[in-house]
UniProtKB/Swiss-Prot annotation:
Keywords: Ribonucleoprotein, Ribosomal protein. The gene is rpsI. The lineage of its organism: Bacteria, Pseudomonadati, Pseudomonadota, Gammaproteobacteria, Enterobacterales. The keyword Ribosomal protein applies. GO terms for cellular component: cytosolic small ribosomal subunit. GO terms for molecular function: RNA binding; structural constituent of ribosome. InterPro entries: Ribosomal_Su5_D2-typ_SF, Ribosomal_uS9, Ribosomal_uS9_bac/plastid, Ribosomal_uS9_CS, Ribsml_uS5_D2-typ_fold_subgr. One of its GO terms (biological process) is translation. The keyword Amino-acid biosynthesis does not apply. This is Small ribosomal subunit protein uS9.
Length: 130
C-alpha cells in the first residue's frame, strides 16, 4: 500500500480490528465494504466516527479496516480503539484529547462465564420455599 500510512490495532470483547490510515478525503472501507454497507445500525456508525469527529479529521483521512470476531457492537468498539491508536501514531499531539474522551483505554470487560447449577452467569433457578 502507500508509504505514508499509519496503523493501529483495536480490540473489544472478542473482536479485533486492524486499522490503516492515510491522507485522503474521508473514505472508510471495512472488510472491502463501505461503512454504511457494513454497519446497518446508525449507533455503530457513530461509534466508528467518534474519534475522527473529535479531532476534526473526518474529511482528511482515508481508512482501510479489517475486523474479525464478535458482534456488531464489539466490532464497532474494536474499530474505534484501532482508529484511536492509528491517529496517535499519525499525530502524537492528539493523545491528550483522545484520552480525555476515553478512546485510548481498552475496554477490558468480557462476558462472564456460565456457572454450573445456575441458568446463566448469575441467574439462579427459581427458589421454592414449599
Amino acid at each position: 500500500m502507500a508509504e505514508n500510512q499509519y496503523y493501529g490495532t483495536g480490540r473489544r470483547k472478542s473482536s479485533a480490528a486492524r486499522v490503516f490510515i492515510k491522507p485522503g478525503n474521508g473514505k472508510i472501507v471495512i472488510n472491502q465494504r463501505s461503512l454504511e454497507q457494513y454497519f446497518g445500525r446508525e449507533t455503530a456508525r457513530m461509534v466508528v466516527r467518534q474519534p475522527l469527529e473529535l479531532v476534526d479529521m473526518v474529511e482528511k483521512l482515508d481508512l482501510y479496516i479489517t475486523v474479525k470476531g464478535g458482534g456488531i457492537s464489539g466490532q464497532a468498539g474494536a474499530i474505534r480503539h484501532g482508529i484511536t491508536r492509528a491517529l496517535i501514531e499519525y499525530d502524537e499531539s492528539l493523545r491528550g484529547e483522545l484520552r480525555k474522551a476515553g478512546f485510548v483505554t481498552r475496554d477490558a470487560r468480557q462476558v462472564e462465564r456460565k456457572k454450573v447449577g445456575l441458568r446463566k452467569a448469575r441467574r439462579r433457578p427459581q427458589f421454592s420455599k414449599r
